């Protein structure tokens, strides 16, 4: 019953609930307990929601569909603040939740007693988290986690999730996911619990890859007209936000809504400057709000064919009669270069990977996905399970200071005060 209590900051701003679940048992190898411990504390009822001035019911002043728990000044309501402060540390409940998340099993009786009877439960709990992170079951859970995050898996579609899991399990720099230039299509042997490095054989020479950005299975899975599905996959999986990716000062372009991208209006193609698709259309929505960024990213993926193989020519089509092959001017006019963001050019996929690896939003996205995993939330995109930046910022700092070791972040979150209090 931690769904109404764990991190009210996140609940108040995103409406996300956290729940625990059950699974089969697993015997871990841990020391025997030596002293008796107290039983698990129980939770009372959640506090009464804020009411309006007349006291006749809960309010939803901001119209977001959730009862207000933050007053107009931006301060958490006293009732909810009190509830947050009333949480108690329960390493037994935390151990159960962590074991289910990290191994897919319940903790063994020995593990439960080890924490329950330990002179310093916090230390004992941390030791068991370390054991879980070294367990082969964690590797399998990590692969499943990245299958879900990447929206792909099974057979050749496992190479990208397996590479991400390898970086996590082996405690490597996680930015290699976007920058590694070789051995980016590893395999995993479940029986032996081993990763085997392997090259992605799709026409790109070894030493010229860019992590999963050149993965053939990814390119095959998200093949589409103008490579827009590939660009969308990159944006949503690694930046944790949909298009439009960038917001600038509103500009009147003669439509019902303003143009809001930071790019110049004519930085992308339309039928008025050489393109065959009118990305300058303003008759309904302002297409360029999304396409200002998207059109600078998508051409980088246009030379992968429908099987994910690299070609010397553009291999994606236009959604027009007879499906003609796209040309560069369908995305960008003469003089424009591909880019990750405004003022961040990326002339090739390796440059794109480097720009993404240095992006604070990409750093925060990786940490947010771990946070949602730990707290039992859904996908930040598919389930719109957003997390306020201030909630994950301490762990983003940990991620940076550890040279982008995502495993360090996993441990930090699973041992965090907010994870062990109920």
Regions found by a protein language model. Give the residues of each.
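Long, charged, low-complexity terminal extensions
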Residues: 93, 98, 137-146, 358-361, ...
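Extended surface/linker regions that mediate inter-domain or inter-protein docking
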Residues: 124-297, 357, 385, 394-405, ...
């Amino acid at each position: 019953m931690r769904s109404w209590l764990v991190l009210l900051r996140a609940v108040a701003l995103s409406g996300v609930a956290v729940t625990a679940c059950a699974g089969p048992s697993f015997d871990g190898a841990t020391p025997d307990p030596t002293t008796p411990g107290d039983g698990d504390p129980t939770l009372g009822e959640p506090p009464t929601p804020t009411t309006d001035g007349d006291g006749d019911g809960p309010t939803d002043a901001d119209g977001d569909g959730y009862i207000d728990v933050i007053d107009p000044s931006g301060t958490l309501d006293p009732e909810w603040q009190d509830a947050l402060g009333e949480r108690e540390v329960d390493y037994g409940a935390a151990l159960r939740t962590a074991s289910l998340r990290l191994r897919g099993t319940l903790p063994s009786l020995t593990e439960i007693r080890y924490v329950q009877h330990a002179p310093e439960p916090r230390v004992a709990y941390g030791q068991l988290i370390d054991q879980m992170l070294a367990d082969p079951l964690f590797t399998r859970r990590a692969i499943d986690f990245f299958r879900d995050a990447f929206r792909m898996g099974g057979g050749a579609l496992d190479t990208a999730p397996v590479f991400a899991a390898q970086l996590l399990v082996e405690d490597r720099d996680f930015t290699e996911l976007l920058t590694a230039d070789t051995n980016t299509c590893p395999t995993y042997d479940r029986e032996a619990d081993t990763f085997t490095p392997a090259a992605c054989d799709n026409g790109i020479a070894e030493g010229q890859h860019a992590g999963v950005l050149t993965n053939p299975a990814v390119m095959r899975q998200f093949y589409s007209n103008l490579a827009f599905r590939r660009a969308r996959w990159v944006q949503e999986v690694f930046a944790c936000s949909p298009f439009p990716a960038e917001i600038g000062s509103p500009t009147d372009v003669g439509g019902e809504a303003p143009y809001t991208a930071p790019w110049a209006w004519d930085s992308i193609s339309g039928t008025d400057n050489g393109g065959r698709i009118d990305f300058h259309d303003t008759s309904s929505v302002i297409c360029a709000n999304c396409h200002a960024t998207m059109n600078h990213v998508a051409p980088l993926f246009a030379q992968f064919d429908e099987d994910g193989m690299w070609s010397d020519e553009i291999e994606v089509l236009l959604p027009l009669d007879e499906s003609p092959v796209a040309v560069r001017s369908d995305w960008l006019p003469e003089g424009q270069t591909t880019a990750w963001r405004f003022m961040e050019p990326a002339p090739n996929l390796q440059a794109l990977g480097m720009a993404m690896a240095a992006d604070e939003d990409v750093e925060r996205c990786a940490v947010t996905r771990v946070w949602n995993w730990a707290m039992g939330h859904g996908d930040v995109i598919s389930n719109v399970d957003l997390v306020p930046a201030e909630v994950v910022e301490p762990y983003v700092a940990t991620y940076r200071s550890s040279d982008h070791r995502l495993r360090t972040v996993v441990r930090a979150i699973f041992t965090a005060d907010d994870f062990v209090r109920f």
